[in-house]
Amino acid sequence: MGKLIFTDRAWNEYLYWQLQDKKTLKRINLLLKDIDRGSFEGIGKPEPLKNHEGFWSRRIDDCNRLVYQVSDGQTEIIQCKGHYDD
């Protein structure tokens, strides 16, 4: 896997899922692996965010999105709970 960086917010959300919902955590981990294989295509319906240039989103489930940015060979996870700017 390439270099993966979590913002403080995203890391706290990731830890939340570890304690609250293993199924959602498993889905997030699957999305992270798929992002490593192809940042802009694959599972979770990857799409660029219209109001945030350079940021992409993938569906975790109906209510939650994984938001990330890829630059210089690294992926920064912005959030993994809620829907975009929640």
Regions found by a protein language model. Give the residues of each.
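Enriched for short, Lys/Arg-rich terminal
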Residues: M1-L4, D8-L25, L30, I43, ...
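Short secondary-structure junctions
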Residues: G38-G42
